[in-house]
């Protein structure tokens, strides 16, 4: 029996390690070469003949124990607790925000040495938004830096609610509260030169950044009476509102805006219970609060506040404060001009704030009896004008005759914008020919006013200034002028779409009826008038009077047809008419307006009208322009119709 073969040992699939366990020698570490860790000498040192030394007491990599905690503590003391360490470790704050917070804390420490920045958590608004959406800080971080952590309620609350939490008051708000307390009780506030500099800086920031878009305060009088009227609560409330808006528009003091807003709102509510008649300062303070809410809060809240301001204006009757006579020698020009400018700022606020959602206006144009404001230079000098400014309706009626200051021009354009918005509302309700005719008359009148003002404004020194170097109000006035032209065009397009949606059958029936009336009962009268066009007089009696009555009746019929058929009317309405009928319709419609120089009549016309001198487009339709000029009609009938695509 054959003997079984012994199984051969299988080779291991794993190759031996290229390196021995242990540490690399110092020579290999120095040369950054791979060390095989052979004993007593590695292969690299054996080949080069170097001494192979292994250091078994090498220190561990990374920072030393307690070094990270020390760095966190130094960072927290450096920025005075203005950053949350969890957001900083997560990379949710930029270097710019860190530096901004650092500068603000250093200024507070310089101006107010008794104020402890580490005594309560402080966060910027952008930091709060990121902290709400960012990850929570780890327990280790909270244990390491407890003074940098804010309470959960403060992290989740918004800016207004966070200011109401029991925490130490910021120095600017504390100083403002002292001034308001002095206005209530008459006790002198604590003098602090450092905080006085901050408040003076906020006052100057207001006139640099807020006043150009809301120019209703006289700068010199306000700054000179800052200390003299500190005991008046309304004046202190206005100053607080000014600093609130100025802080909101400044990156340096933005963190104080919410606290100032809450303090100002409380005083405004207190004034409502004290003042029986709203004062001018109270109205100005509420108007600035509405401006702040529009910048920093929801739009609905700003609408509620500005509506309250409008009611205060109506209670104080600012809209009719100008007397019918000229200002006397004993009148205060600055106070009167501040009253006018306060009303006009609120008026423009009403026009543009409600135009976004097309809400009705609160301050109606018909109830205004107050003059337009003078130029900014005449107001700040102050220098009363030799001739008083026009009223609003006078300035609109004299469009194209004289230029106005930028603020006054801005008010007129805001009024025209409001009229255009009302015209758009009426365009959505067009259903009859009479309504359509009235709409286009109003549209044409508005277009003429805007065209005249645009032509005159383009040559004024304010309009020729580059927008980059111009003040904000002048730049916005130039943009508003161009926007108003575009808005009028869109309103006209809305009306065309509304008229185009009318029943086509109804248009054709009215057109058939109008053409039949012209072709039967009035055809002889029209031809008779045409043959005696050179000697025809509408005002004569006898046969001429009979012809005049027939012409007027036919013109009314033709005008009714044209009003139904114009502006994107179906072409079929004209195809049922003969060439002579359309020609008679046009001439009859012109004779209804003998006093007009010209008018624009846009209609979709069939291609066969090309033989009357009308340019026809590629699609076979063109837009004609009928010019009502008596002399041209008598000389040549063909010049009564001009073609425009």
From Swiss-Prot:
CDD domains: fungal_TF_MHR, GAL4
Entry's Gene Ontology BP terms: DNA-templated transcription
Any one annotated GO CC term: nucleus
PANTHER family in the record: C6 FINGER DOMAIN TRANSCRIPTION FACTOR DBAA-RELATED (PTHR47338:SF3), ZN(II)2CYS6 TRANSCRIPTION FACTOR (EUROFUNG)-RELATED (PTHR47338)
Biased composition annotated in UniProt, kind: Basic and acidic residues: 113-131
SMART domains from the UniProt entry: Fungal_trans, GAL4
GO MF terms, alphabetically ordered: DNA binding; DNA-binding transcription factor activity, RNA polymerase II-specific; zinc ion binding
Name of the protein this chain belongs to: Transcription factor AN6788
Pfam families attached to this UniProt entry: Fungal_trans, Zn_clus
SUPFAM superfamilies for the chain: Zn2/Cys6 DNA-binding domain
The species this protein was found in: Emericella nidulans (strain FGSC A4 / ATCC 38163 / CBS 112.46 / NRRL 194 / M139) (Aspergillus nidulans)
InterPro entries the record matches: TF_fung, Transcription_factor_dom_fun, Zn2-C6_fun-type_DNA-bd_sf, Zn2Cys6_DnaBD
UniProt DNA-binding residue ranges: 25-52
Taxon lineage: Eukaryota, Fungi, Dikarya, Ascomycota, Pezizomycotina
Region called Disordered, residue ranges: 1-21, 113-170
Cell compartment(s), UniProt: Nucleus
Keywords attached to this entry: DNA-binding, Metal-binding, Nucleus, Transcription, Transcription regulation
Free-text function comment from the UniProt entry: Transcription factors AN6788 and AN6790 act in tandem to regulate the expression of the non-reducing polyketide synthase pkfA from the aspernidine A biosynthesis cluster. They do not control the expression of the other genes involved in aspernidine A biosynthesis, nor do they regulate the expression of the highly reducing polyketide synthase AN6791 and the esterase AN6793 with which they are predicted to form a secondary metabolite biosynthesis cluster.
Lineage: superkingdom: Eukaryota
């Amino acid at each position: 029996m054959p003997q079984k073969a012994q199984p051969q040992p299988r080779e291991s699939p794993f190759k031996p390690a290229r390196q021995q366990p242990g540490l690399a020698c110092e020579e290999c570490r120095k040369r950054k070469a791979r060390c095989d860790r052979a004993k007593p000498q590695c292969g690299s040192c054996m080949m080069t003949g170097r001494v192979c030394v292994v250091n078994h007491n090498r220190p561990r990599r990374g920072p030393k124990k307690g070094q990270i905690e020390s760095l966190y503590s130094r960072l927290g003391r450096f920025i005075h607790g203005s950053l949350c360490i969890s957001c900083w470790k997560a990379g949710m704050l930029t270097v710019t925000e860190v530096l901004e917070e650092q500068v603000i804390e250093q200024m507070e420490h310089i101006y107010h040495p008794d104020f402890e920045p580490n005594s309560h958590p402080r966060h910027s608004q952008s930091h709060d938004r990121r902290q709400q959406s960012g990850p929570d800080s780890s327990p280790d971080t909270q244990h390491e830096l407890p003074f940098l952590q804010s309470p959960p309620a403060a992290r989740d609350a918004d800016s207004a609610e966070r200011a109401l939490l029991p925490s130490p008051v910021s120095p600017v708000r504390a100083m403002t509260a002292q001034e308001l307390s002095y206005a209530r009780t008459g006790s002198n506030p604590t003098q602090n030169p450092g905080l006085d500099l901050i408040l003076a800086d906020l006052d100057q920031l207001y006139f640099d950044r807020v006043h150009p878009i809301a120019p209703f305060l006289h700068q010199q009088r306000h700054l000179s009476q800052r200390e003299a009227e500190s005991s008046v609560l309304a004046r202190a409330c206005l100053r607080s509102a000014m600093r609130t808006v100025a802080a909101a528009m400044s990156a340096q003091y933005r963190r104080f805006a919410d606290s100032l807003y809450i303090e100002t709102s409380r005083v405004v509510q207190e004034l409502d219970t004290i003042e029986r008649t709203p004062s001018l300062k109270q109205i100005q303070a509420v108007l600035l609060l509405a401006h702040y809410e529009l910048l920093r809060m929801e739009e609905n809240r700003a609408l509620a506040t500005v509506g309250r301001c409008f009611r205060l204006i109506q209670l104080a009757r600012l809209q009719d404060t100008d007397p019918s006579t000229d200002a006397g020698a004993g009148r205060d020009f600055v106070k009167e001009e501040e009253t006018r400018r306060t009303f006009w700022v609120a008026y423009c606020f009403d026009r543009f704030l409600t135009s976004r959602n097309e809400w009705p206006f609160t301050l109606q144009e018909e109830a205004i009896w107050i003059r337009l404001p003078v130029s900014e230079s005449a107001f700040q000098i102050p220098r009363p004008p030799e001739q008083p400014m026009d009223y609003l309706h006078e300035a609109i009626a004299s469009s194209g005759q004289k230029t106005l200051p930028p603020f006054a021009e801005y008010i007129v354009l805001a009024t025209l914008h409001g009229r255009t918005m009302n015209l758009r509302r009426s365009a959505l309700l067009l259903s009859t020919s009479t309504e359509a005719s009235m709409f286009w008359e109003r549209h044409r009148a508005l277009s003429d006013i805007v065209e005249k003002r645009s032509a005159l404004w383009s040559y004024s020194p304010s309009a020729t200034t580059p927008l980059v170097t111009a003040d904000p109000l002048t730049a916005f006035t130039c943009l508003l002028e161009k926007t108003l032209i575009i808005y009028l065009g869109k309103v006209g397009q809305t009306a065309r779409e509304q008229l185009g949606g009318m029943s086509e059958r109804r248009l054709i029936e009215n057109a058939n009826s109008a053409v039949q009336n012209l072709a039967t009962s009035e055809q002889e009268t029209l031809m008779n008038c045409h043959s005696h066009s050179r000697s025809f007089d509408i005002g004569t009696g006898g046969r001429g009077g009979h012809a005049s009555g027939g012409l007027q009746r036919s013109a009314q019929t033709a005008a009714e047809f044209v009003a139904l058929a114009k502006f994107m009317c179906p072409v079929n309405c004209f195809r049922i008419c003969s060439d002579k009928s359309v020609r008679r319709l046009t001439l009859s419609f012109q004779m209804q307006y003998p006093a007009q120089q010209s008018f624009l009549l846009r209609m979709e016309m069939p291609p066969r009208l090309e033989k009357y001198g009308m340019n026809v487009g590629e699609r076979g339709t063109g837009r004609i322009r009928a010019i009502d000029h008596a002399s041209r009609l008598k000389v040549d009938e063909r010049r009564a119709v001009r073609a425009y695509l």
